[in-house]
Curated annotation (Swiss-Prot):
It catalyses: L-glutamate = D-glutamate. Its EC number is 5.1.1.3. Keywords: Cell shape, Cell wall biogenesis/degradation, Isomerase, Peptidoglycan synthesis. SUPFAM superfamilies: Aspartate/glutamate racemase (SSF53681). This is Glutamate racemase. The keyword Isomerase applies. It comes from Escherichia coli (strain K12). Monomer. InterPro entries: Asp/Glu/hydantoin_racemase, Asp/Glu_race, Asp/Glu_racemase_AS_1, Asp/Glu_racemase_AS_2, Glu_race. Pathway: Cell wall biogenesis; peptidoglycan biosynthesis. Belongs to the aspartate/glutamate racemases family. Substrate binds at D28, S29, Y60, G61, N93, T94, T205, H206. The gene is murI.
Length: 285
């Protein structure tokens, strides 16, 4: 069922049909991927965007790798059957670390993943101490440790895995206040350090949504680093050099996996990000 947004008594009108534009899917388990989408849209405003979020299986951080791979492939397949894709962005660190090989094997369009911005953080740190703030799944996965060994072996890496911060970011987009006390409790291991990290990698796409609150809690001068801008640049290059000619003149659309009250409450948020319609996506499996 498609749901149009209302603003007071003014109906939300669909966008005027335009020239066909390359269709780009941005996918996440929740709404954290909107932070990545926002960076891509800033660089590439004239694309046809689809945002899909898996509110049935959210969050992915505690799910098995086999489940995540099967689920992500099924969702991208379902979107591709509705709209031929020029490119897909898996805007979820957890899903990216395990599902990219399967996606790239199945589809002929480029698939971009999101990985923790450890390499730029290692370049930016002044005291040699880098914090990685991510889900527990990302913190534990061997891929993350390989990135650290490759790009930050001369740094002291302090890792914190938190599922609660994902929930805080989702709640913020639903209009709820973010508890600074909750953030202080989550970050307590760093806040108690004699010399805490001066550079923090936001290793989950939900966490840039909490940037304002994090800067209030972390020591003054702490740098926050995420992958959004780099993903946008990579997307632009691939669309120019490798993407198939898959275009649509339709308005931007968002897909959820179940039309729950929580999903419906996100309609005003999605409209602010430029998505005219929210629909339930039928996924096999």
């Amino acid at each position: 069922m498609a749901t149009k947004l209302q603003d007071g008594n003014t109906p939300c009108l669909a966008a005027t049909p335009s020239e066909p534009r390359p269709t780009v899917l941005v996918f996440d388990s929740g709404v954290g991927g909107l932070s990545v989408y926002d960076e891509i849209r800033h660089l590439l405003p004239d694309l046809h965007y689809i945002y899909a979020f898996d509110n049935v299986a959210f969050p992915y951080g505690e799910k098995s790798e086999a489940f995540i791979v099967e689920r992500v492939v099924a969702i991208v397949t379902a979107v591709q059957e509705r709209y031929p894709l020029a490119l897909a962005v898996v805007a979820c660190n957890t899903a990216s670390t395990v599902s990219l090989p399967a996606l790239r094997e199945k589809f002929d369009f480029p698939v971009v993943g999101v990985v923790p911005a450890i390499k730029p953080a290692a370049r930016l740190t002044a005291n040699g101490i880098v914090g990685l703030l991510a889900t527990r799944g990302t913190v534990k996965r061997s891929y993350t440790h390989e990135l650290i060994a490759r790009f930050a072996n001369e740094c002291q890496i302090e890792m914190l895995g938190s599922a609660e911060m994902v929930e805080l970011a989702e709640a913020k987009l639903h209009g709820e206040d973010v508890s600074l006390d909750a953030l202080k409790r989550i970050l307590r291991p760093w806040l108690r350090m004699k010399e805490p990290p001066d550079t923090v990698v936001l290793g989950c796409t939900h966490f840039p949504l909490l940037q304002e609150e994090l800067l209030q809690v972390l020591p003054e001068g702490t740098r926050l680093v995420d992958s959004g801008a780099a993903i946008a640049r990579r997307t632009a290059w691939l669309l120019e050099h490798e993407a198939p000619d898959a275009k649509s003149a339709d308005a931007n659309i968002a897909f959820c996996m179940a039309m729950t009250p929580g999903a419906e409450q996100l309609l005003p948020v999605l409209q602010r990000y430029g998505f005219e319609t929210l629909e339930k996506l039928a996924v096999l499996g």
